[in-house]
């Protein structure tokens, strides 16, 4: 592509601005395109799913799918870097030949974003990073939202500026400068998986009838990107958009259910944060385990909820059902409440190799939970009495670790 074409474009842009006299039109950064930007992206963890011999499920393929890519370019660096231009590409990890202005610049890449990038026109970087996604939009069909880190660079004039391999792009890209490698994208969600439920071997004769599994203290919004560097590139939101509610619940969201595990106010119930099966009966000899070819008994996408979170705002996985002891006593509506990845609850916590140590819910990780029932649970979902009734094992897994489930004999 000939760079002189972009010089002609700058004349057109300048003329359009000069001819406008509408004082209501917001002031835009008028830039002179005198270089191009081409970049390649990759989804963090996708390399494992493409490895030879790995059986990749349809679900895992969808988790890595890029439907849209938005490349946002800002002039300058820091919070006051001002919007320069953007490009949206569909169904591709490559975005070639974006007309840009040379000089100090900041780049942010968004995947599967629910926000029209035109909303960012005239905005500063700090303003753009305040935008949020909703957990309602995090579906496999539309694609999981992702973002790059905030990249500061210097774009060279009269040059094709490239992130990735120049040979990945069609056409002549000479002269060029490689500004960096392929840009990695990180999902905004974490995943909480219930892997198994069983009755303790010391609790012979007891039965638990599982009737519902739901999430609580889930943040319904996440920022679209972060300036923080990996592994602490948090996108946690601490407020909901105007008129919306930050804290979401699969069930029991009302304030009068509050206890030590739930101190939030004015929450909202969201159907997809609950799983209600036909009643499943669990005994010492009938363990509820993840089926072959499945990831979990029940699985939920959630947003980040970080280490400063008090006990009453930590993300929870709650099981509800009927407990029958070995004497036949029936106790309905019993709860087993698990504070996800909480080191202070006496759980067995296991972290995968090379995982940054953390004790909260962090994006792009899976939290795999196994529950052993020792006795009757609590009659309220958010009271800590449930801890004495169960043993919990939580495995923190990097997103790219694919578990190969064995056949259950």
Task: Show which residues each predicted segment covers.
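Sec-dependent bacterial lipoprotein signal peptides
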Residues: 1-17
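Extracytoplasmic cysteine-anchoring/structural motifs
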Residues: 19-409
């Amino acid at each position: 592509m000939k760079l002189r074409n972009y010089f002609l474009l700058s004349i057109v842009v300048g003329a359009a601005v000069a001819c406008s006299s509408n004082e209501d039109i917001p002031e835009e950064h008028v830039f002179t395109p005198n270089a191009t930007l081409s970049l390649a992206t990759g989804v963090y963890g996708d390399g494992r799913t493409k490895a030879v011999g790995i059986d990749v499920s349809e679900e895992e393929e969808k988790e890595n799918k890029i439907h849209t890519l938005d490349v946002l370019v800002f002039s300058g660096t820091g919070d006051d870097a001002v919007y320069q231009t953007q490009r949206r590409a569909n169904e591709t990890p490559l975005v070639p030949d974006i007309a840009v202005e040379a000089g100090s610049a900041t780049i942010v890449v968004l995947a599967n974003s629910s926000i029209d990038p035109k909303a960012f026109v005239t905005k500063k970087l700090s303003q753009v990073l305040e935008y949020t996604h909703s957990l309602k939009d995090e579906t496999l069909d539309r694609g999981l939202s992702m973002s790059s880190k905030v990249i500061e660079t210097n774009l060279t004039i009269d040059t094709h500026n490239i992130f990735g391999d120049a040979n990945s792009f069609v056409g002549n890209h000479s002269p060029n400068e490689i500004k960096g490698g392929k840009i990695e994208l990180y999902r905004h969600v974490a995943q909480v998986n219930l892997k198994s439920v069983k009755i303790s071997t010391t609790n012979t004769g007891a039965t638990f009838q599982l009737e519902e599994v739901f999430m609580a203290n889930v943040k319904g919004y996440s920022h679209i990107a972060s300036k923080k560097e990996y592994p602490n590139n948090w996108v946690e939101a601490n407020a909901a958009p105007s008129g919306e509610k930050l804290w979401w619940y699969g069930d029991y969201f009302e304030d009068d259910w509050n206890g030590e595990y739930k101190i939030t106010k004015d929450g909202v119930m969201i159907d997809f944060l609950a799983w209600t099966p036909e009643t499943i009966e669990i005994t010492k000899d009938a363990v509820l385990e993840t089926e072959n070819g499945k990831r979990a008994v029940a699985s939920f996408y959630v947003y980040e909820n970080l280490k400063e979170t008090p006990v009453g705002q930590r993300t929870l996985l709650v099981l509800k059902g009927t407990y029958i002891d070995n004497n036949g006593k029936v106790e309905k509506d019993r709860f087993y409440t698990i504070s996800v990845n909480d080191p202070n609850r006496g759980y067995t916590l296991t972290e995968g190799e090379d995982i940054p140590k953390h004790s909260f819910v962090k994006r792009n990780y899976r939290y795999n939970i196994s529950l052993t029932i020792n006795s009757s649970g609590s009659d309220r979902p958010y009271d800590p009495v449930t801890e004495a009734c169960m043993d919990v094992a939580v495995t923190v897994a990097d997103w790219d670790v694919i578990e190969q489930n064995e056949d259950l004999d």
